[in-house]
Structure formats: structure tokens, C-alpha cells
A protein has these predicted regions:
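Conserved catalytic core of Hanks-type protein kinase domains
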Residues: 31-34
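A beta-strand edge to alpha-helix "cap/lid" segment located at domain peripheries
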Residues: 1-27, 37-145
Length: 145
């Protein structure tokens, strides 16, 4: 079988990411490298490093969301080299957060880095934050929650 192209991996990624907002982290886990240098920085704070921490953080994130729906991806830019690639996007969702009665729309600014391992593209870093829209200067000085 021919290894997937980077665009094919991005297509898989776009199918997997919304599953987190439906309480299912498994499709995203399948995309990740299992090596100790992987990282995840998500909107719930902190940076997970190494597969064990990243896996736990994905499980935690999936428990925060219910009834998620993907509204779309806006690709800002991407770049592919021989063995590394990155993708910068805005992801748009609707989901219930932390058991809320009503779903809310939200957008995440996301940078994802991939590495080719044994011929296959694997996710090695994902940074997602809610700063998809311009933030006030004051938001920079707010204490971390």
C-alpha cells in the first residue's frame, strides 16, 4: 500500500478532530506519533509532552465536550518538506461545554506539526487556543485560569 500524501493525512485529520467534541479522542490518537517528543497545548491549559501525557490530555479534552459539530476549517497556510510539514488553521465548532444545556459556537486558532515516520505522516505537535479573533490588550494581562 502506498503511504498517504500529506494532503490525504490532512483530510484524515479533518475527519478526526471533530470527534474530540463528540467525546471520542480515539481518531486523533491514531494520528499522533507515539514517541516521547510529541506535544499538545490545548485551550484547557498547560503543555503535555510525551505520548503518555498527550494521550491523557486528549482523553481529558474529550470529556469537556458533548454533541459537537464541525462548522468548518479555514486553512491559513501549510508547508511540506521532505519529512516535516505544518498546518495553520482556524477550526470552527459548535458543542456543549462542561455539560452546558445549550451548545455554543467557538473557533480555535491551531498550529499542527507533522513528521514522516516510516513513510507515514504523524502528528507531533498541536497547539490550539481560542484566540482565533483579535483579543484586547487587556486579555494578555489576565491571570491564567
Amino acid at each position: 500500500m502506498l503511504a498517504p500524501s500529506f494532503q490525504e493525512e490532512v483530510d484524515r485529520y479533518h475527519l478526526a478532530v471533530p470527534e474530540i467534541t463528540r467525546g471520542n479522542p480515539e481518531p486523533v490518537k491514531e494520528l499522533y506519533s507515539k514517541l516521547d517528543d510529541v506535544t499538545l497545548a490545548n485551550p484547557f491549559g498547560g503543555i503535555a509532552r510525551g505520548w503518555a501525557q498527550v494521550e491523557a490530555r486528549l482523553d481529558q479534552a474529550s470529556r469537556q465536550f458533548q454533541d459537537g459539530q464541525m462548522l468548518g476549517f479555514d486553512t491559513i497556510t501549510s508547508y511540506t518538506a521532505r519529512d516535516t510539514a505544518y498546518l495553520v488553521e482556524t477550526e470552527h465548532f459548535r458543542a456543549r461545554l462542561d455539560g452546558a444545556a445549550v451548545a455554543e459556537e467557538f473557533a480555535l486558532r491551531v498550529t499542527s506539526i507533522f513528521r514522516r515516520e516510516e513513510g507515514y505522516w504523524k502528528l507531533v505537535h498541536r497547539h490550539a487556543d481560542p484566540a482565533a479573533r483579535p483579543q484586547s490588550r487587556r486579555s494578555l494581562t489576565q491571570p491564567a485560569g
